[in-house]
Amino acid sequence: MLTNIIILIILYLFYDFCYKNFKYRNYGSPWALPVIGHFIHVINQPHLVVHNDRMKYNNGRFVNYWFGDYLSIAITDPILYKKIYLNFPKQINSRLKSPTVLNISERFRGIISSNENNWDFHHGILSKLFNGHKAKINNFLFEKETKFIIEYMKKISKSGENFDTRSNFLYFYSNILFDYILGKRVENIYENELRKDRKKFMVSIQEVMDSVGLIKFLNYLILSYPFLSIYLRYFTYTTFNLKKILKQYYDEHLETIDLNKPRDVLDNLIMEYKNQNAIECDKSFVAIAIELLAAGTDTNSSTSEWFLTYLVNNPIYQDKIYDELIGALKINKPLKGSDVLINLSHRPLTPLFNATLKEVLRLIPATPFSVPRMSNEGFEVDGIKIPKGTYLFPSMYSIFRDEKYWGENANKFYPERFLTDSHSNNYFPYGVGKRMCLGSNFSQHELYICLTNIVLNFKIKSIDGKPLNEIPNYGITFRPNIFEVKLENR
């Protein structure tokens, strides 16, 4: 009996090895191991592995990998990326339906992880709240929070203390989102003890989101799904506690809502569910809130850290941007009573700042890999056959550093490249197509208002006079090493 089992296992391993390595061998890829596929190959700094592999296979356009049971395609060429995402939205309008995603998203009810039906409904609601006439309300929130962080930074500068970029940017962006989504802004968050609870909440959200990261083996091994589901349901507490807290917020809103005066995103979501006679609004809200708070806070806080990193390491740009901001204020004076000096009306007058922020997002995209898609039916593009059930993940790191499109200095910090060319054909940090980031304007506006006013008010220096580390740490988002900076009032 035991011998037969061993023989069956060996035969299965041989079959799986042959299937993974010869079924789609006409598309170049590294050799895959049975069962686990390429997990060992990409386990260490996967963005660099993919970036190096792209030059060995398929003319630098894509690389095939096997993650467990799933054929996966890393898209490394911007033209191919746009062709697939713009021309085949119906075929790729799905996500990986693993037990981890199912657990976090309340059965795919979120906005990032949602299935096809839930996405259309929730996108229709949220797109109205993050764009259009709501933009003025959003900008007021950005300006108000920027005023508070600038005041705190002035205190830090006066005291001679260093500015903790990681914690304070997390507080800044989470406070905006908590205010907008839940009406739960924390006053004096930069000095108040309540910030510890907020940080703990955000760390918990990040832990939950990390569990669905690209290199989480059991999410891709179908045989493990029953066991993984049991583990997630009965032995993980972070997700349970987060959902419990968010459900309390939902119940509070349900009791106090004024249907004629919605206060925040949650009120609007409740009202839309009532209007549509939809059910289980609480579960949808929990999934949406986790995803919005995680994505909206972590991406922009890390981008802000990287922006300061490059300004510290390239002080000439810091001075040039400051001069540009002063010039913009002379042309377009700030509104009387405004919380900040620089606002969105100055944006057309600050081309160098705009180019510098674009360059930071090019070199260090918010996420190394765009949120992956799953093909729900087979299709063909440029002679490349993509079967049903294929996992597609654009490598933004590779797309934004391809010398074919960005020149020999693709790996260098050079903001001027965006002063002469918008690079619209190969620069899309918020994605493309039907399911691109719905909060792209929200994100860009809060980054602009926050970072311009920081540069306007302070000279930013490293605490030891040495350059800051520019090597990103791989994760759901690219993070720099934790660092502090010196602030000098201008």
Swiss-Prot record:
Keywords: Heme, Iron, Membrane, Metal-binding, Monooxygenase, Oxidoreductase, Transmembrane, Transmembrane helix
E.C. number: 1.14.-.-
Name of the protein: Probable cytochrome P450 518B1
Family per record: Belongs to the cytochrome P450 family.
Organism annotation: Dictyostelium discoideum (Social amoeba)
Main localisation: membrane
Annotated GO CC locations: membrane
Keyword flag Oxidoreductase: yes
Origin superkingdom: Eukaryota
Database matches in SUPFAM superfamilies: Cytochrome P450
